């Protein structure tokens, strides 16, 4: 769905065009931006700049604060991990937003993800599942982040552990994630995450330094 913003001169701009000018601070556009946030949740799309603009408008206009939109923005920013979108969004929160119980729950979930305690995350996610039920693709976005961490941490991993880290998924779904990430089943309940040839190898670098380049420096040391 295309979102157009109506200007005072009667003309319309796209949200991206509006965000590139002073109109991004016009509270008259907040409802359109909030609708855009809801569409992102529904359609599994993401626009960080627009979402941060909403939080900034809340700062300037606290009486227009919408907590449901705040939750959606924060949860959508979690789907972009390992990027720092959540930190940027959190920095724009008002004191009343920070005191909100649901906001604190989302912040706790973010902390758990950042320290890679994925088993605990899925437990907390199950308890709070209604909070992000409306966000399409939320679980798979988190699994993509989990896969990123696994890929940078393990060479091989037990299949049962991988299944647990990905949220206790079905065996068929696990096989799909293994294939998606280019991993290999080794047998005996193990998954090869990184081949030996993919490991970082040391390399000796020889740099030729001409005497003229250091002559002046050596002269100063005499």
Swiss-Prot record:
Q: Which InterPro entries match?
A: ARM-type_fold, CSN8_PSD8_EIF3K, eIF3k, PCI_dom, Transl_init_fac_sub12_N_euk, WH-like_DNA-bd_sf, WH_DNA-bd_sf
One matching Pfam family:
CSN8_PSD8_EIF3K
Give start-end ranges for the coiled-coil region(s): none
Q: Which keywords does UniProt give here? A: Cytoplasm, Initiation factor, Protein biosynthesis
What would you give as a GO molecular function for this chain, any one? ribosome binding
Entry annotated with the keyword Cytoplasm: yes
Point out the signal peptide segment: none
**Where in this chain does the record put each PCI domain?**
46-208
The record's listing under Gene3D superfamilies reads: ARM repeat, domain 1, Winged helix-like DNA-binding domain superfamily/Winged helix DNA-binding domain
The Gene Ontology biological process annotation of the record reads: formation of cytoplasmic translation initiation complex; regulation of translational initiation
> Where does the UniProt annotation locate this protein?
Cytoplasm
In terms of superkingdom, the source organism counts as: Eukaryota
Per the record, its GO cellular-component terms are: eukaryotic 43S preinitiation complex; eukaryotic 48S preinitiation complex; eukaryotic translation initiation factor 3 complex
**What PANTHER family is this protein classified in?**
EUKARYOTIC TRANSLATION INITIATION FACTOR 3 SUBUNIT 11, EUKARYOTIC TRANSLATION INITIATION FACTOR 3 SUBUNIT K
Q: Which family does it belong to?
A: Belongs to the eIF-3 subunit K family.
The protein's job, in short, is: Component of the eukaryotic translation initiation factor 3 (eIF-3) complex, which is involved in protein synthesis of a specialized repertoire of mRNAs and, together with other initiation factors, stimulates binding of mRNA and methionyl-tRNAi to the 40S ribosome. The eIF-3 complex specifically targets and initiates translation of a subset of mRNAs involved in cell proliferation.
The subunit structure is: Component of the eukaryotic translation initiation factor 3 (eIF-3) complex. The eIF-3 complex interacts with pix.
Specify the protein name. Eukaryotic translation initiation factor 3 subunit K
